Amino acid sequence: YEIKLHGKNGCMAYRKGLQSGVRKQLGFALKDISEHLPGAFIIYRADKEDDELFYANNEFLHMAGYKNVDELFQITKKSFRNLIREDERQQIESSIWEQIDNGNENDYTHFHLRKADGTYLSVLDHGRIVDSQQYGRVFYVLFMDWEEMHIHYGDKLLG
């Protein structure tokens, strides 16, 4: 079972100390994790011209008021930039790409996220750029509701 944690169709010679307890990790399906993780996230194409949205978990849809992923894709035209308030778009996209172009695999930014009803939610965005075999370069992005963070963490955010 240990070899399964490193991908399908693998093999490994037996060696003393292989952990059978690792089997527990195999019981969690990606869908279970993405739908029950206490965090809103999306996945989108990491391309300055074509930032196509691929995925949003239920936590993101709920936080932003979208009924389902189809409504999200329709309203945003499947584009990440259409989630950013228009007057912030250029500055936020520049900030993200400047961080990546400077050799960082993570980016951090704060902006106003477009909700399904057209209102905006102040969010912290923590993105990571990765190479996907299937989609090429993509961003995995976690979102935190800025106001909720201040309510729950208050002064702890300041250090």
What do the predicted segments below correspond to?
Residues 12, 42-45, 112:
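Conserved beta-strand cores of small sensory beta-sandwich domains that regulate signal transduction
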Residues 18-23, 27, 144-159:
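PAS-associated C-terminal cap
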Residues 87, 91, 101-128, 134-138:
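Per-ARNT-Sim (PAS) sensory domains and their PAS-associated C-terminal
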Residues 12, 31, 54, 157-158:
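Signal-transmission coiled-coil "S-helix" linker that connects upstream sensory/regulatory modules
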Residues 1-6, 12-25:
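Cyclic nucleotide signaling catalytic output domains
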Residues 29-78:
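PAS-family sensory domain signal
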Residues 5-7, 125-154:
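Short loop/turn elements at sensory-signaling interfaces that couple input to output
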